[in-house]
Structure formats: structure tokens, C-alpha cells
């Protein structure tokens, strides 16, 4: 994938998510976002239901628009597994729970700090393996810089949910196979 094609994809996005102003991105603007990503996030904390706090790194409007534009681009890389109920249209917490109706036992596990546990290195490897020779290592680095904060996937970025599902796809396949082997059901819900 050439840099020009990537920039054209972002430059042509003029939809307005969540009432934001239409935005087109020049190569200079994208470069600025990649070279100084720390300037484009606003950190804050939210209380967790279970106690403690969840650290959010919300992208500033321009970077948020870039990430919002990239999300469908990343979505083309995979088809979510049937067992994945996080951040998929029409597949929420209720549909996730329905998978387990009638079961005698239920095991609920939480992956602590799931978003920031996904590193920039992991994402780069994933991009290179999924796109193969279409994506140069340089372009993979560019994508990673646009969607990570301090080398990690941030909570609060519009591209993070689809990327967590992409990273977890192999895990889903393995855990679903293991569950099936033992006569159990597996699903993954992310909120």
C-alpha cells in the first residue's frame, strides 16, 4: 500500500461522526500527529464499577477523526469470530449472555487493562502479517503511531475497539476450540 493511497483514504473522509466537523487531512497534518502523538491526547480517569479507576487517553479532535476514519479500514482486515461480542454492531452484552443460557456453570474472566496490554510492536506485526507485501514496514509504523499512545493501545480512541477484536481473533479461535473440546461454550465480550 503506497503512502499516497493511505493519505488519499484519510484525505477523502468527510463524514461527521458524533457531530464533529468534516475534516480532510494533509500529509503535513498526519506527519505532525505521528511525530508528536503525546500532544494529541487528553488523559483523564473514570471510576470503575468494581472500584478503582480506569485511565482514559482521549484523542484530540483531529487525531480522533483520523482514528475514526481508520476504524473501517481496519475492519476490512478480518471477520469477527461468532464468539466475539465486543464492539460489534448488534452483538452486545445481551447477545453474549444468550450464548450461555441453560448452562449449569459459567466462568467469567476479565483481562486486566486489555487495551493498554496491546503494544505498538504487536500491532505492527499484526499489520505486516495481515497485509503482507502490500504494506511496507514504514507504513505499518505510520499506522501504529496514529493509533497508539506511549507505545500502547489507548482506551478512548475510536480505532482501539476494532483493533482489540483484531488482536483477539486468534485467542478467540483457540479458546472456542478448547471450550468445544470439553463440551463448553465460549464467548468474549468487551466493554
Residue ranges and their predicted role:
Residues 99-190:
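Conserved polymerase palm-domain catalytic core
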Residues 44-67, 85-89, 108, 145-165:
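Short, conserved non-catalytic motifs in the polymerase core
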Residues 39-42, 91-93, 178-182:
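Short amphipathic beta-strand starts and helix->beta connectors
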Residues 63-108, 112-116:
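Active-site-proximal segment of RNA-dependent polymerases
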Residues 24-28, 63, 67, 80, ...:
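Alpha-helix initiation and N-capping motif
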Residues 11, 74, 78, 131-132, ...:
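A broad structural signal for alpha-helix termini and local helix breaks/kinks
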Residues 1-43:
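Non-catalytic, polymerase-adjacent accessory regions of viral genome-replication enzymes
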Residues 30-49, 136-146:
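Reverse-transcriptase-like RNA-dependent polymerase core
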Amino acid at each position: 500500500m503506497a503512502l499516497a493511497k493511505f493519505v488519499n483514504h484519510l484525505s477523502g473522509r468527510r463524514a461527521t461522526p458524533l457531530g464533529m466537523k468534516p475534516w480532510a487531512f494533509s500529509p503535513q497534518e498526519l506527519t505532525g500527529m505521528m511525530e508528536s502523538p503525546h500532544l494529541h491526547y487528553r488523559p483523564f480517569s473514570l471510576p470503575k464499577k468494581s472500584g478503582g479507576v480506569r485511565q482514559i487517553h482521549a484523542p484530540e479532535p483531529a487525531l480522533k477523526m483520523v482514528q475514526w476514519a481508520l476504524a473501517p479500514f481496519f475492519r476490512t482486515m478480518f471477520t469477527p469470530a461468532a464468539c466475539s461480542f465486543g464492539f460489534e454492531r448488534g452483538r452486545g452484552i445481551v447477545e453474549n449472555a444468550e450464548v450461555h443460557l441453560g448452562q449449569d456453570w459459567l466462568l467469567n474472566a476479565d483481562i486486566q487493562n486489555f487495551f493498554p496490554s496491546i503494544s505498538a510492536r504487536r500491532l505492527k506485526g499484526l499489520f505486516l502479517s495481515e497485509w503482507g507485501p502490500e504494506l511496507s514496514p514504514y507504513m505499518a509504523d505510520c499506522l501504529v503511531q496514529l493509533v497508539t499512545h506511549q507505545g500502547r493501545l489507548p482506551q478512548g480512541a475510536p480505532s482501539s475497539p476494532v483493533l482489540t477484536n483484531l488482536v483477539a481473533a486468534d485467542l478467540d479461535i483457540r479458546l472456542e476450540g478448547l471450550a468445544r473440546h470439553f463440551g463448553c461454550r465460549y464467548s468474549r465480550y468487551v466493554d
